[in-house]
Curated annotation (Swiss-Prot):
GO molecular function: aspartate-tRNA ligase activity; aspartate-tRNA(Asn) ligase activity; ATP binding; catalytic activity, acting on a protein; nucleic acid binding; transferase activity
Keyword set, alphabetical order: Aminoacyl-tRNA synthetase, ATP-binding, Cytoplasm, Ligase, Nucleotide-binding, Protein biosynthesis
Signal sequence annotation: none
Gene giving rise to this polypeptide: aspS
Superkingdom of this protein's organism: Bacteria
Source species: Halothermothrix orenii (strain H 168 / OCM 544 / DSM 9562)
Residue(s) at site: Important for tRNA non-discrimination: H38, G90
Protein name in the entry: Aspartate--tRNA(Asp/Asn) ligase
Family according to the record: Belongs to the class-II aminoacyl-tRNA synthetase family. Type 1 subfamily.
Length: 590
C-alpha cells in the first residue's frame, strides 16, 4: 500500500551522490529501475532525473526496511533514508557516475506502486514509436529523453540570457490572429462571439514583430510557438517552436554578428567549438557548386559545368540542350568507376525523381574509358571534360543535361545520396555557412504568378529595385539563411520599411491593392508613421536541438510531439467534438 511522503525531504539527487558523501546520511527519492536479490541481500537501482544510485537492503542492518524491499517491483516510486558507503572493490561499476558508492538503506517508504510497464525504461529498447508516444510519460523516464529535455531547457535559458545581455526584450505576440493571403496552411479557430469568423494560429510572429519595431521596441525576441497545417514530412511538426529575433537600425552584418555569438554559446553547451567567422556564400554560388541553397560543405563532389566543352558536340543530348538555353553539369564520384551497372542504373532512376530525363556517365577504368556516350564525344571533348572535372583513373563521372533548375536539383540530390551511401561524410564535422542574396521571388507555374521566395515583406537589394517593373525574377533580396551540414537552421531578412516599396512588391506578386489593404492594412498603415530600418531571423528550436543532441527524430527533442499524421496517440487528438459545441460555434459538418 502506498505511503505518504509525510514531511520527508529529499537531501540529494540520486545521480549526484559521490565519494564526498561517504559516511553521511542521505534521503533519495525516485523510481525502482531494477531489483536484485543476492545472497540474502536486496539491491535496488533507484532512478531519478539525475541518474541512478544503488541502494542495499540487508536484514542484519534493518529487518523492517529489508522486508518492505521484498515488495518492490520495477517503476515503484520510493523514498529511501540511508548512509552512503564505498562499494566493495569487486562491486565498483565504472559505467555510471555513482559506481563507486552505494546507500545502505535504513528506512524505506513506498510512495506509489506501478503496473508492469509496456516497455522497459531503458535507452536500448526495440519498440514502435507509436507505443512510445502513447505512453510518453514512461518514455520520458528514459535517460536519453531526460537528457534531451534538459538540453532544451539549457538552450532556451542560454538564448534568453545571451539576448538579454545584448539589450533584447522578450515580448509575447498574439496566438489568436487572422489569416493572410499566404496562409493556405493556417490552423483556423472559429469564433463563438463572431459567427462565421475565424482566428488563425500564427505560422510565425512576422507581422507583429515588425509592428514592434515600428512601435520603438528596437530589439525583440520571443521563443515562439508556431503552427502550420501542412502535409507532414519527416521531422516536421504541426506545432513547433522558433527562436524569433527582430532588430531596428541594423544591416545583415549586425544580424550575422549577433547570431554567430549566440550559436557559439549554444554549441558550447555540447562541447562543440564553432569558428569565430562563419563564411558567407551567395545563393547562386551555392546552386552552381552544390545544386542546393542549403549546401553541405563537409565533402566535395561539387557540380562542374561542362556546357562550353560539349556545346558543339555530336552528342545531341548534350549540344541540343545547350543550344536551347540549358546546361550540362556533372559530378565526379572519386573512385566510383568500380560501381556495378546496377548501381549506376539506380542513380539514373533517382535523378528522374527530380525531373531529369536521364543520367549520362563515364567510368575511367584502368583499362580505358567505359561509357555509353564516349563514342559520341571527340578526344578533345573527353579531355576537356576530364580537365573540368578533375578526373583521374578510377573515377565515375555522372552528368545531367537539362534546364538549370532541374540540373541543380537532380545532381545536388544525387551528390548527397552518393555521399551518404558511400560514407563520404565525416563524423563530428560541423560546417556552417550563411547563404545570402536569394531571389526575391520565383515564378510558380501552377499559380501562374510570381510568389515570394521567403515572404512578401523581404526587402530587395537596393541596386535591384529598378528591376521590379521589368525583370522581377532577376531581383535579389536581402534574405539570408543560416545553414549547417546541409540543413537550414534559421532564416531571415532585412524587411521593407517603406509603404511605397511594399506596395510595389505586392504588385509584382500579383497581390492587389485591395487585397493588400484587406489583409495587411494594419502594417501598411503603420508604415505611414515612421518605420525604422529593421530585420531579423528565426531559428527552428526543434531542428537546432536535433543537431545539438545528435537525435535522428525531431520527436525525440519535444516532450509531447505529434506523429507524422499530425495526431497524438497519448491524448488521441484530434478528436470529434459534441454537436452542442458545433452549434455554439455555428459550424455544420457534412
Amino acid at each position: 500500500m502506498a505511503e505518504s511522503i509525510n514531511g520527508l525531504k529529499r537531501t540529494h539527487y540520486a545521480g549526484k551522490i559521490s565519494t564526498q558523501q561517504i559516511g553521511k546520511k542521505v534521503t533519495v527519492m525516485g523510481w525502482v529501475q531494477k531489483r536484485r536479490d543476492h545472497g540474502g541481500v536486496i539491491f535496488i537501482d533507484l532512478r531519478d532525473r539525475s541518474g541512478i544510485v544503488q541502494v542495499v537492503f540487508n536484514p542484519d542492518n534493518n529487518e523492517r526496511a529489508f522486508k518492505k524491499a521484498t515488495e518492490l517491483r520495477s517503476e515503484y516510486v520510493i523514498a529511501v533514508e540511508g548512509e552512503v558507503e564505498k562499494r566493495p572493490e569487486g562491486n565498483i561499476n565504472p559505467d555510471i557516475p555513482t559506481g563507486e558508492i552505494e546507500i545502505r538503506g535504513n528506512r524505506l517508504r513506498i510512495l506509489d506502486e506501478s503496473e508492469t510497464p509496456p516497455f522497459e525504461i531503458d535507452d536500448d529498447i526495440n519498440v514502435g514509436e507509436d507505443l512510445r508516444l502513447k505512453y510518453r510519460y514512461l518514455d520520458l523516464r528514459r535517460p536519453r529523453m531526460k537528457k534531451n529535455l534538459e538540453l532544451r531547457h539549457r538552450v532556451m535559458k542560454t538564448t534568453r540570457d545571451y539576448l538579454d545581455d545584448n539589450g533584447f526584450w522578450e515580448v509575447e505576440t498574439p496566438i489568436l490572429t487572422r489569416s493572410t493571403p499566404e496562409g493556405a496552411r493556417d490552423y483556423l479557430v472559429p469564433s463563438r462571439i463572431h459567427p462565421g469568423h475565424f482566428y488563425a494560429l500564427p505560422q510565425s510572429p512576422q507581422l507583429f514583430k515588425q509592428l514592434l519595431m515600428v512601435g520603438g521596441v528596437e530589439r525583440y525576441f520571443q521563443i515562439a510557438r508556431c503552427f502550420r497545417d501542412e502535409d507532414l514530412r519527416a521531422n516536421r511538426q504541426p506545432e513547433f517552436t522558433q527562436i524569433d529575433i527582430e532588430m531596428s537600425f541594423i544591416d545583415k552584418e549586425d544580424v550575422f554578428s549577433l547570431v554567430n555569438g549566440l550559436m557559439k554559446r549554444l554549441f558550447a553547451l555540447v562541447d562543440i567549438e564553432i569558428p569565430e567567422k562563419i563564411p558567407v556564400m551567395p545563393y547562386q554560388e551555392a546552386i552552381d557548386r552544390f545544386g542546393s541553397d542549403k549546401p553541405d560543405l563537409r565533402f566535395g563532389m561539387e557540380l562542374k559545368d561542362v556546357s562550353d566543352v560539349v556545346k558543339d558536340s555530336e552528342f545531341r543530348v548534350f549540344s541540343g540542350v545547350v543550344k536551347d538555353g540549358g546546361q550540362v553539369k556533372g559530378i565526379n564520384f572519386k573512385g566510383g568507376a568500380i560501381s556495378p551497372r546496377s548501381k549506376i542504373d539506380g542513380y539514373t532512376d533517382y535523378v528522374k525523381i527530380f525531373g531529369a530525363k536521364g543520367l549520362a556517365w563515364i567510368a575511367l577504368k584502368e583499362n580505358g574509358l567505359k561509357s555509353p556516350i564516349a563514342k559520341f564525344l571527340s578526344e578533345k571533348e573527353l579531355e576537356g571534360i576530364k580537365e573540368k572535372m578533375g578526373a583521374q583513373t578510377g573515377d565515375l563521372l555522372l552528368f545531367v543535361a537539362d534546364k538549370p533548375s532541374i540540373v541543380a536539383d537532380a545532381l545536388g540530390n544525387l551528390r548527397l545520396k552518393i555521399a551518404r551511401e558511400e560514407g563520404l561524410i565525416p563524423d563530428g564535422v560541423y560546417k556552417f555557412v550563411w547563404v545570402v542574396d536569394f531571389p526575391l521571388m520565383e515564378y510558380d507555374e501552377d499559380e501562374g504568378r510570381y510568389v515570394a521566395k521567403h515572404h512578401p515583406f523581404t526587402a530587395p537589394l537596393d541596386e535591384d529595385i529598378p528591376l521590379l517593373d521589368s525583370n522581377p525574377e532577376k531581383i535579389r533580396s536581402k534574405a539570408y539563411d543560416f545553414v549547417l551540414n546541409g540543413e537550414e537552421l534559421g532564416g531571415g531578412s532585412i524587411r521593407i520599411n517603406n509603404k511605397d516599396l511594399q506596395m510595389k512588391v505586392f504588385n509584382a506578386l500579383n497581390i492587389s491593392e485591395e487585397k493588400a489593404s484587406d489583409k495587411f492594412g494594419f502594417l501598411l498603415e503603420a508604415f505611414n508613421y515612421g518605420a525604422p530600418p529593421h530585420g531579423g531571423i528565426a531559428f527552428g528550436l526543434d531542428r537546432l536541438l536535433m543537431v545539438l543532441s545528435g537525435s535522428e527524430s525531431m520527436r525525440d527533442v519535444i516532450a509531447f510531439p505529434k506523429t507524422q499524421k499530425a495526431s497524438s496517440p497519448l491524448t488521441e487528438a484530434p478528436s470529434t467534438v459534441a454537436e452542442k459545441q458545433l452549434r455554439e460555434l455555428h459550424i455544420k459538418i457534412d
